[in-house]
Amino acid sequence: MNPFVSPCEFTRRDVLCVAAACAAGLLTGGPAQATEAPAFEIVDPPQVISWKPPLYHGWPTLARRKNGELLLVWSGGRESHVCPFGRVEFMISPDDGRTWSWPQVLLDGPIDDRDAGVVETADGSILVTTFTSLDYQPMLEQAEKLQPGQPGAWEPLRLREWQAVQRRISAEQRQAELGTWMTRSTDGGVTWSARYATPVNSPHGPIQLADGRLLYCGVELWKPEHRVGVCQSTDDGLTWDWLATMPIRPGDDSTEYHELHAVETASGKLVAHIRNHNPVNAQETLQTESTDGGKTWTTPHSIGVWGLPSHLLCLRDGRLLMSYGHRRPPRGNQVRVSSDAGQTWSEPILLTTDAYSGDMGYPSSVECEDGTLVTVWYERLKDSPLAQLRQTRWRLKG
């Protein structure tokens, strides 16, 4: 979840922003024409894979290890989209998502642990990322002003639980807990390091490059500069150095760039996607590219895709796959394919169109040995306010 953007709902303001974006596209020529979407088939229909439905699950990331295991991380143990109870959870599938292990809690600090990313490094280590947030505090402060029986007043137990969280540490200590974090396992996820700070955060975390480096495109959270850029690690994720600051499109505000993810193409070119909340191309995914290993990047530009945030994957045949949430009708999860290293993208493939609300998305995808694709996302279902993890298995036919 982007900590600077109110969650999920598509408002009248959004409609006006999208209309402005469309007008701007007509004036400037807009993105390249989309190509026809390849044929696909659903192998296994969407299903809930959460082990604990009475709790809220959000913002997952799926990755595949070299040994074929699937890794899934998310923010679990939650009461709602914004609350103080979030913790980073992790589970493994040995059979391409057909079965999953019982969740393991990796991080559970005194404030909210949110969106989780995961990657396996070239050395076989597993890196998991997250960020911490105090966005729940204004909600608690407002609730404490209301008397029982007043409109909007909380149930007494809920109020006591939130207040108990606040009493764990002081206000100064809570501020010190804000940060962007990583934890690391070198034994396949059995044991984990203490968390350590990273310069940036993005929901799906860093990527492994062919030259051995790890690349992390993201945003500096909780810092005045709020830089949008790229960090690299040359020691298996132990330490991170700032590599480049992303250029800003003329007229844009960099604080409206969020939730980046990148992929290395077969040629070595890097493609990164950005969640955009500027008035032009609002709620769209912007794209930027690098041909020098991430040292410099092109000015972000529209690719004509409404929906966010994007997760990128390079398929074995060299094509790129972007997966993203679509929070207006047809509400659900979509993917697009690029056969030319991101120069153009196909029309959308509609993986799901049955989402009950905008509290959903953040899909990520992996390619299995047999060529099938597994996509996992989070979604608030019709019969409960507690969002769950959902999964589908599918295949490109062309």
PLM regions and their residue ranges:
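N-terminal secretory signal peptides
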Residues: 1-10, 17-25
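Generic detector of low-complexity/intrinsically disordered segments
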Residues: 6, 18, 28-29, 211, ...
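Short, cationic motifs built from Arg/Lys/His that form the positively charged side of catalytic pockets
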Residues: 12-13, 92
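Positively charged, low-complexity intrinsically disordered regions
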Residues: 13-14, 115
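Bacterial Sec-dependent signal peptides at the C-terminal "C-region" and cleavage site
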Residues: 26-37
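Asp-box/BNR beta-propeller blade signature and adjacent active/binding-site loops
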Residues: 35-398
